[in-house]
C-alpha cells in the first residue's frame, strides 16, 4: 500500500482520487504507518518537514530522498542514525523508462539499497553511483529529458519549415530519438561510431551534421550539463 501526506486538502483529495492511495495531513501520521519514507519536497522545505511537531523518524525508517542537491550528510543531521538513500530520478519515470541514480548514506544497508533499487527499477533503470557524482548525474539524466524535449521540438519545427504537418513532424522526431537511443543501448556501439555510419560521403546527413557543428551543438549540450550540475551543487549549499 502507498500513502502520501500533504497539508492542502485539495492536494490530498486529488492524490486519493487520481492514484487511489492513502493520504495523511501530516508527515507524523504517515511515518507511524510505514518504515519506508520518500522525501519529495523542495530543498527549502526540508527543515520544516523534519521539524514538524510529533514527527518521529529513527533508525527503523528507511528514507529515500529525491530532494535536488541535498546530501545524505545534511539529511542525517536531521535524523541521527537514520538510514538515508539519496536518489535522482527523472521525468521519464512517468512512462516507466526512467534513468535513476542512487547513493547510500553512512547508515544505509545492502538490504536498503536492494529495496530502493527495486522501487526504481519498477519505473525504469537504476544505477548506484558515488554521492560525489550526484550533481553530475543531475546535469545528465535529471535535467536531460528537458534538453531532449527541446531537441524534438526544434526538429519538428524544422520539419514544419520544410512543409510537414506539425503532428507528423513531432511523431517523426520523437520516434527518431527513441530509435536512436535504443540503438545505442542495444548495440553497445559508441554514439560517434553510429553517427558516422549514418553519414554517407557528400550526403544529406553529413550536411546536417555540419550545420549543427557550425552552431557548436556539442558545446551547447556540454555547457547545459555543467550548468545544471553547478546549480545542483549550489542548491546543496543552500544557495
Question: Where are the regions a protein language model picked out?
Answer:
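Short pre-catalytic strand/loop immediately N-terminal to key active-site residues, enriched for Gly-Thr
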Residues: 84, 134-139, 191-196
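NAD(P)-binding Rossmann-fold cofactor-contacting core
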Residues: 1-18
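NAD(P)-dependent Rossmann-like dehydrogenase/reductase catalytic/cofactor-binding core
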Residues: 174-239
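Small-residue helix-packing motif on alpha-helices
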Residues: 2, 12, 30, 46, ...
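Internal alpha-helical scaffold of NAD(P)-dependent oxidoreductase catalytic cores
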Residues: 74-83, 99-136, 148-186
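Rossmann-like NAD(P)(H) cofactor-binding subdomain of soluble oxidoreductases
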Residues: 9, 18-19, 26-102, 106
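Glycine/serine-rich anion-binding loops at beta->alpha junctions
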Residues: 88-93, 138-148
Amino acid at each position: 500500500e502507498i500513502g502520501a501526506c500533504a497539508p492542502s486538502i485539495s492536494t490530498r483529495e486529488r492524490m486519493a482520487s487520481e492514484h487511489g492511495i492513502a493520504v495523511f495531513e501530516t508527515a507524523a501520521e504517515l511515518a507511524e504507518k510505514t518504515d519506508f519514507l520518500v522525501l519529495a519536497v523542495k530543498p527549502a522545505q526540508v527543515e520544516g518537514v523534519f521539524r514538524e511537531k510529533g514527527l518521529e523518524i529513527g533508525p527503523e525508517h528507511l528514507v529515500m530522498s529525491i530532494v535536488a542537491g541535498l546530501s545524505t550528510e545534511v539529511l542525517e543531521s536531521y535524523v541521527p542514525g537514520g538510514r538515508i538513500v539519496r536518489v535522482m530520478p527523472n521525468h521519464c519515470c512517468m512512462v516507466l523508462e526512467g534513468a535513476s541514480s542512487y547513493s547510500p548514506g553512512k547508515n544505509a544497508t545492502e538490504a536498503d539499497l536492494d529495496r530502493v533499487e527495486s522501487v526504481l527499477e519498477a519505473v525504469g533503470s537504476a544505477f548506484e553511483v558515488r554521492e560525489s557524482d550526484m550533481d553530475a548525474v543531475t546535469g545528465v539524466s535529471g535535467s536531460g529529458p528537458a534538453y531532449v524535449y527541446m531537441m524534438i521540438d526544434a526538429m519538428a519545427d524544422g520539419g514544419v519549415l520544410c512543409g510537414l504537418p506539425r503532428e507528423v513532424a513531432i511523431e517523426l522526431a520523437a520516434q527518431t530519438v527513441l530509435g536512436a537511443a535504443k540503438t545505442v543501448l542495444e548495440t553497445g556501439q559508441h554514439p560517434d561510431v553510429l553517427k558516422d555510419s549514418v553519414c554517407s560521403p557528400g550526403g544529406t546527413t553529413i550536411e546536417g551534421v555540419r550545420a549543427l557543428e557550425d552552431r557548436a551543438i556539442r558545446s551547447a549540450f556540454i555547457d547545459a550539463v555543467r550548468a545544471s550540475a553547478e546549480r545542483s551543487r549550489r542548491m546543496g549549499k543552500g544557495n
